[in-house]
């Protein structure tokens, strides 16, 4: 029996060796990509094609427990190159799960916590990354007294998030990177874009991120232009009657707003101007109940007061309960100790983010447009961030050696009619790296109303080439021109294609295995047949040699012996012949054997061995 000390030392040394080989990240408690894998999402339809998903928290400020939640969907197809679209909703403080489950994500929520497929999902040709931004929004969290106050701090934290995300998922770091979102994301996205461009200048070419485009829908980009557009839009839409007392009251408020903006130009928030929107909602209120006031996100609709659109869209009543389910919380890899229940918008984030002295993102666009294309799109029925304000923004903006959509002095880029599957969808207008798209009959959340049209817009902007994929392209035309095929239907997604390719390879491997087995069996049969044939040939050769020997012996005798034998035999086979024993006795045996040996071999013990050495 070995001494106890010797056994203990060996065991301890073995344990230390294992610890030495154990990954440092494991000892430190760092997560890997596998920890974020979404294994099973509750409510998926049975016929749903498989989509690879990852979700969870990434820490951005350890000192304040600041964590951003993300939900990543892999693309269905790769069209000529890899792309990733980061989607952000607005607020500030409103969750990007609105975008994931009501706008551009692959699923929509219905009653009974069921999911259905979105036929206009933006992950058709791009990986989709939804982030609840900034900290405290949606599933993201931070210590109560540590909400951020400004756009620069937000952008810095987002760069930290991306650094850690790409460390976990390096396969996406070299993708063409796009940012998309709506409403107050019109502030977030340009600030993040500027931070990325600044970062790229400090990195080697291999470490840079390929920022390839920005898409902002009904964006709060230029507060001055949007604040001036509330009244203009309301008069154009007939919400406020021109020349009425209500119109005069609002015009007075507009003058106060304009004065404040002239004193403090370029700010993000102007309380004096926001009061105009509130007054419009108040003046257009009718009675009580769920139809009391105008829906500020879609003026064709009405809502209860004082919500005036906050209860919209209708899918919202399903999204909240779905995301609060324990099994969904578990599936999305959420920290149960930190989860306080999903809220669409966090008023605390909003209250802390209102930094009136911040510089509006409109000031960043000219420099960004030197390097990165930007697409602004608007739903024509939105009031709060309406298309009139966006069009004023463009007209007043100077970039890339021109102002507005002027292409030559006095000539502006035309508004080109866009038709989608036979219907007039809106118009496109573009010049010098900036594109503007107006969606007819659409709300503040354009992809909610027109998922397939919005994806067609995305695909055109990203210059998607689907020629190598197959499927049925959509009929999308600008000024009657078909252009490249940008939307596809009926094609299998990457996961399905990979599974089928794997199955095909397995079948091919099985066939090759069967083929090899058949070849082996055939070789064995050939060898066996050859051996059997050789055996038969040897036996017949021996018989022929013996027969020839008897003939040779008989040829040297008198007719009295052999002639008598030959005349009497009924067959040439000696064993079958009937002959007279006395005749055979008279054959001179020794002499005939000597002659026979000189001409034939009748197979002594050494013959087979000698023959074997000469075969080639």
Swiss-Prot record:
The chain crosses the membrane at residues 517-537. Its EC number is 3.4.16.6. GO terms for biological process: apoptotic process; proteolysis. It is an enzyme of class 3 (hydrolase). Keywords: Apoptosis, Carboxypeptidase, Glycoprotein, Golgi apparatus, Hydrolase, Membrane, Protease, Signal, Transmembrane, Transmembrane helix. SUPFAM superfamilies: alpha/beta-Hydrolases. GO terms for molecular function: serine-type carboxypeptidase activity. The keyword Transferase does not apply. Glycans are attached at residues 119, 357, 433, 441, 493. Residues 29-516 are lumenal. Residues 468-504, 577-616 are annotated as: Disordered. Its main location: Golgi. GO terms for cellular component: membrane; trans-Golgi network. The keyword Manganese does not apply. Pfam families: Peptidase_S10. Residues 538-616 are cytoplasmic. Residues 1-28 form the signal peptide. It catalyses: Preferential release of a C-terminal arginine or lysine residue. It is a single-pass type I membrane protein. The active site is at residues 183, 382, 444. It comes from the Eukaryota. Belongs to the peptidase S10 family. Protease with a carboxypeptidase B-like function involved in the C-terminal processing of the lysine and arginine residues from protein precursors. Promotes cell fusion and is involved in the programmed cell death. This is Pheromone-processing carboxypeptidase KEX1. It comes from Metarhizium acridum (strain CQMa 102).
């Amino acid at each position: 029996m070995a001494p106890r000390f010797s056994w203990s030392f060996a065991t301890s040394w073995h344990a230390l060796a294992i610890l030495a080989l154990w990954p440092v990240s494991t000892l430190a408690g760092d997560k890997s990509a596998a920890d974020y894998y979404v294994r099973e999402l509750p409510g998926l339809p049975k016929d749903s094609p498989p989509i690879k998903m990852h979700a969870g928290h990434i820490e951005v400020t350890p000192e304040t427990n600041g964590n951003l939640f993300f939900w990543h969907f892999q693309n269905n197809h790769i069209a000529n190159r890899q792309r990733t679209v980061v989607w952000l909703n607005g607020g500030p403080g409103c969750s990007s799960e609105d975008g994931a489950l009501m706008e551009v994500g692959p699923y929509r929520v219905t009653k009974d916590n069921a999911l259905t497929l979105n036929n206009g999902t933006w992950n058709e040709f791009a990986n989709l990354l939804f982030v609840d931004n900034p900290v405290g929004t949606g599933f993201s969290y931070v210590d109560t007294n540590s909400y951020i106050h400004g756009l620069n701090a937000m952008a810095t934290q987002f760069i930290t998030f991306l650094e850690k995300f790409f460390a976990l998922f390096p396969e996406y770091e070299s993708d063409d990177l796009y940012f998309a979102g709506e409403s107050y994301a019109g502030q977030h996205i340009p600030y993040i874009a500027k931070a990325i461009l600044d970062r790229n200048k400090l990195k080697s070419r291999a470490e840079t991120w390929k920022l390839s485009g920005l898409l902002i829908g009904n964006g709060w980009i230029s507060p001055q232009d949007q604040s001036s557009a509330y009244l203009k839009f309301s008069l154009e839409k007939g919400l406020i009657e021109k020349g009425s007392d209500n119109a005069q009251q609002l015009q007075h408020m507009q003058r106060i707003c304009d004065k404040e903006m002239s004193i403090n130009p370029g700010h993000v928030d102007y309380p004096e101007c926001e009061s105009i929107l509130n007054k419009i909602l108040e003046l257009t209120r009718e009675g009580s109940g769920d139809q009391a006031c105008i829906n500020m996100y879609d003026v064709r609709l009405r809502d209860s007061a004082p919500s005036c659109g906050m209860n919209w869209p209708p899918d919202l009543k399903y999204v909240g309960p779905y995301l609060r389910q324990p099994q969904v919380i578990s599936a999305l890899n959420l920290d149960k100790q930190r989860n306080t229940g999903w809220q669409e918008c966090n008023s605390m984030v909003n209250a802390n983010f209102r930094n009136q002295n911040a510089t509006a993102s409109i000031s960043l666009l000219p420099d960004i447009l030197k390097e990165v294309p930007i697409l602004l799109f608007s739903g024509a029925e939105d009031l709060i961030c309406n298309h009139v304000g966006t069009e004023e923004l463009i007209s007043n903006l100077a970039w890339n050696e021109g102002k507005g959509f002027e292409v030559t002095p006095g000539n502006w880029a035309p508004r080109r009619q866009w038709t989608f599957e036979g219907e007039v969808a809106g118009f496109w207008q573009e010049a010098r790296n900036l594109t503007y798209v107006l969606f007819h009959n659409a709300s503040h959340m354009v992809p909610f109303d027109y998922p397939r049209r919005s994806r067609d817009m995305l695909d055109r902007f990203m210059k998607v080439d689907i020629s190598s994929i197959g499927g049925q392209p959509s009929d999308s035309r600008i000024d009657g021109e078909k252009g490249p095929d940008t939307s596809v239907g009926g094609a299998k997604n990457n996961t399905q294609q990979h599974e089928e390719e794997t199955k095909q390879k397995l079948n091919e491997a099985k066939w090759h295995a069967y083929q090899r087995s058949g070849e082996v069996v055939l070789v064995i049969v050939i060898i066996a047949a050859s051996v059997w044939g050789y055996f038969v040939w040897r036996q017949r050769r021996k018989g022929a040699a013996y027969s020839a020997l008897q003939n040779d012996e008989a040829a040297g005798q008198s007719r009295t012996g052999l002639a008598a034998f030959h005349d009497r035999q009924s067959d040439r086979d000696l064993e079958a012949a009937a002959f007279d024993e006395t005749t055979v006795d008279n054959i001179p045996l020794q002499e005939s054997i000597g002659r026979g040996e000189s001409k034939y071999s009748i197979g002594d013990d050494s013959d087979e061995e000698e023959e074997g050495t000469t075969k080639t």
